[in-house]
């Protein structure tokens, strides 16, 4: 089978869960069945890679369009890159797109090459209204591109049952076209790896427990709510915020002000690492952390929780989207329910209460080392049993085979 993967994120340009998903899924697809399949990846960037079962080519915009609103530049770049992708994606049996950035290209390839189109739902634009801060009115264009792609897709991979429900509710996709295939984790890479040198490098004390956040500074990831929870945490705990890549200058300022307030209002040591760290250092932080916190207000799946659990770290997370399909409340962590404003306006109705509830859950685990240890062991076991990339790649390949078979039958009819 010749598989086309279209994506905006691919190593080394990975900054979110979608990029992690594409990296590992692609690798596993290329390795399945003794290399009988060939995977062609077209990604935003300048990547270049070739092996008998995998070819990766980066695509960059050939020119820049002078946009009246600078926030529109990303959309224009995306459309040019998608046009280039659609011309390069040839000799395929199926095309698989990840995030709205590649949807225009996927729709073109479906029509030009007469092959089935698959989309993976890493997120849905209607659930991310704050993106208008980053894209301006181009947010409405990205939403239109996404809606058009879902209307044209032969198959949709939902990374959680919650996402399947959202796809059906928002875009009215036939449930028979949607298959739930969870995200996964590299069990060899993500496992407990102590490294006291990493703690020393960032000024994290080894004689006191710390609570960890890892992620981008975005509305979606809810980091502001965690920062606002710090003053309610037990004395003596450190807070490590491994948080960089702010979506906009405005949220960068908001984050800085929130951290300054937290430092002024509490006696806690707050370590803010303002960059996205390489995997080995993040794994060391997971390993040494007492608790990992995921305060997302919108999370279709949440690979980040799998990473922490694989490193035997208990999780406190918001009970939104696909997170409850990963974190078992009371077994591998604790879930906190933020009451959303509405089905599409996912920010908490009462932000202060959400912050207090996060702190209360963290305090429960801080006060009970035996419970933390039990959850840590169960977390690793759950990940091993249910979230291996090999299994996920095989499920995805099976979906491809079903879609190609149905497409072939329609052509013969």
Regions found by a protein language model. Name each.
Residues 284-289:
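Short alpha-helical donor nucleotide-sugar binding micro-motif in glycosyltransferases
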């Amino acid at each position: 089978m010749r598989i086309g993967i279209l994506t905006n994120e691919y190593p080394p340009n990975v900054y979110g869960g979608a990029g992690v998903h594409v990296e590992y899924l692609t690798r596993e697809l290329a390795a399945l069945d003794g290399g009988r399949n060939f995977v062609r990846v077209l990604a935003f960037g300048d990547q270049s890679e070739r092996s008998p079962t995998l070819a990766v080519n980066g695509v960059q915009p050939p020119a820049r369009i002078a946009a009246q609103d600078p926030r529109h530049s990303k959309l224009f770049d995306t459309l040019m890159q998608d046009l280039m992708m659609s011309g390069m994606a040839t000799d395929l049996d199926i095309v698989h797109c990840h995030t709205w950035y590649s949807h225009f290209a996927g729709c073109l390839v479906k029509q030009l090459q007469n092959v089935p189109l698959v989309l993976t739902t890493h997120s849905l634009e209607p659930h991310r209204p704050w993106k208008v801060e980053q894209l301006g009115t181009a947010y409405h264009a990205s939403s239109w591109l996404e809606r058009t792609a879902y209307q044209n897709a032969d198959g949709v991979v939902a990374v959680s049952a919650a996402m399947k429900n959202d796809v059906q509710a928002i875009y009215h996709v036939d449930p028979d076209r949607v298959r739930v295939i969870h995200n996964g984790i590299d069990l060899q890479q993500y496992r407990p790896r102590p490294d006291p040198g990493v703690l020393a490098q960032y000024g994290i004390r080894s004689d006191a427990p710390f609570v960890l956040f890892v992620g981008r500074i975005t509305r979606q990831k809810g980091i502001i709510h965690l920062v606002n929870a710090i003053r309610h945490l037990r004395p003596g705990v450190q807070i490590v915020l491994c948080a960089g890549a702010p979506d906009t200058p405005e949220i960068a300022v908001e984050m800085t002000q929130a951290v300054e307030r937290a430092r002024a209002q509490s006696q806690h040591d707050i370590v803010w690492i303002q960059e996205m760290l390489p995997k080995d250092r993040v794994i060391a932080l997971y390993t040494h952390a007492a608790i990992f916190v995921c305060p997302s207000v919108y999370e279709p799946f949440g690979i980040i929780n799998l990473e922490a659990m694989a490193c035997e770290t208990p999780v406190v997370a918001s009970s939104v989207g696909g997170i409850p399909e990963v974190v078992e409340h009371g077994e591998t962590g604790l879930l906190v329910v933020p009451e959303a404003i509405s089905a599409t306006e996912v920010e908490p109705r009462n932000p202060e209460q959400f912050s207090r509830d996060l702190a209360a859950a963290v305090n429960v685990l801080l006060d009970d080392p035996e419970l933390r240890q039990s959850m840590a062991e169960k977390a690793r076991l759950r990940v091993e049993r249910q979230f291996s990339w090999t299994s996920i790649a095989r499920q995805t390949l099976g979906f491809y085979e079903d879609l190609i078979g149905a497409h072939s039958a329609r052509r013969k009819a």
